[in-house]
């Protein structure tokens, strides 16, 4: 029903609760970028997209109200879309997303990109427009990404890769806890190492698995420096690449022509991610999700929405791969915060 509604632009349909849902603004993927977006670097260049093509990618930030409405589903704890903030956790009745399914969020926000005989879905948070300048921060765009990940169920051999902001900016929300593995790219410089140390310090209490990819490592001295400063967290290093340079010049080559040493580095990254599957802790993901929701609710969300957003927490709901796991009083058991127990 929802896929059909998306394909027929402009048509209105109702969900099971009788609410009328409309396609998000700009759902036509052929629409031109708005505001100042065309003046900013376009995403997708690393996948071989031409700048003009990349500039037409649909932005999740623009479609945030629609994303909220879809994910909200029939969750009785969420009174309206206006009551949802970027950290609102899923609960009974919420719609969950899967990597390999067709759903309205993917239909509206993902562009399929051909990759040497296969393809991948590419989504972008969205760039600043002229209307945003001076009055909004980029975290308002990233909120759509955080909601997406909070409602995502991914399984073995499924990958969602997020290119995050650099360094400490990642800690402006709970987004940094949404990953099985975080790869931090660091150059062999004091500044590169300091970003790593800062990130590791901020993440130390949240069980974040962190590995470092040494970038622009061209000399033995570069490798020795990173090993001395980073130690066992240094996973792989990459140096100069003619393949990458050609892509940056707008002449992308097939992925099969990537240098052997760089292909080996990427393979090692994938194996590192695959190894985390056995250690996946859905209860910890849910606990941290609720933890940051309560922090945001108390610091600004309650005042912004005029509601007690702690009441959105479903005390029996724990996210898991089946999408159906419920533990009676699960969050009361998992969370050691009195505010949560009182709210739910």
Q: Where does each model-flagged region fall?
A:
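Phosphate-binding/switch loop-helix module in NTP-utilizing enzymes
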Residues: 84-168
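Walker A (P-loop) phosphate-binding loop of P-loop NTPases
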Residues: 10-11
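Hydrophobic anchor at the beta1->P-loop junction of P-loop NTPases
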Residues: 6
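N-terminal phosphate/diphosphate-binding loop that engages ATP/GTP or pyrophosphate donors
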Residues: 24-118
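C-terminal lobe/tail of nucleotide-utilizing enzymes
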Residues: 205-344
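Hydrophobic positions on the alpha1 helix immediately C-terminal to the Walker A/P-loop
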Residues: 17
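Conserved lysine of the Walker
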Residues: 14
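Conserved catalytic-core segment of NTP-binding enzymes
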Residues: 135-256
């Amino acid at each position: 029903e929802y896929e059909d509604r998306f394909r027929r632009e402009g048509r209105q349909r109702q969900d099971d609760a009788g609410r009328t849902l409309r396609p998000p603004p700009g759902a036509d993927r052929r629409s031109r970028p708005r505001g100042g977006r065309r003046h900013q670097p376009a995403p997708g260049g690393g996948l071989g997209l031409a700048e003009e093509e990349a500039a037409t990618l649909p932005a999740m930030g623009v479609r945030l109200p629609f994303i909220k409405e879809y994910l909200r589903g029939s969750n009785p704890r969420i009174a309206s879309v206006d009551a949802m903030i970027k950290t609102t956790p899923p609960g009974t009745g919420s719609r969950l997303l899967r990597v390999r399914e067709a759903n309205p969020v993917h239909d509206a926000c993902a562009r399929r990109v051909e990759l040497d005989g296969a393809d991948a879905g590419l989504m972008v948070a969205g760039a600043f427009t002229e209307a945003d300048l001076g009055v909004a921060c980029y975290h308002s765009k990233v909120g759509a990404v955080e909601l997406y990940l909070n409602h995502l169920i991914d399984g073995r051999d499924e990958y969602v890769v997020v290119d995050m902001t650099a360094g400490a900016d990642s800690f402006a929300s709970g987004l940094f806890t949404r990953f099985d593995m975080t790869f931090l790219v660091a150059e062999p410089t004091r500044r590169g190492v300091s970003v790593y140390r800062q990130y590791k310090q901020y993440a130390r209490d949240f069980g974040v698995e962190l590995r470092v990819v040494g970038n622009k490592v061209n000399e033995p001295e570069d490798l020795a420096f990173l090993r001395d400063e980073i130690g066992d967290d240094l996973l792989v290093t990459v140096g100069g690449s003619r393949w990458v340079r050609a892509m940056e010049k707008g002449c992308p080559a097939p992925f099969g022509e990537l240098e052997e040493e760089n292909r080996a580095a990427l393979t090692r990254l994938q194996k590192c991610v695959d190894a985390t599957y056995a250690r996946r802790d859905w209860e910890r993901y849910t606990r941290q999700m609720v933890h940051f929701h309560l922090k945001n609710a108390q610091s600004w969300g309650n005042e912004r929405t005029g509601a007690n957003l702690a009441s959105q927490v479903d005390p029996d709901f724990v996210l898991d791969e089946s999408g159906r796991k419920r533990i009676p009083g699960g969050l009361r058991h998992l969370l050691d915060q009195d505010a949560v127990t009182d709210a739910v």
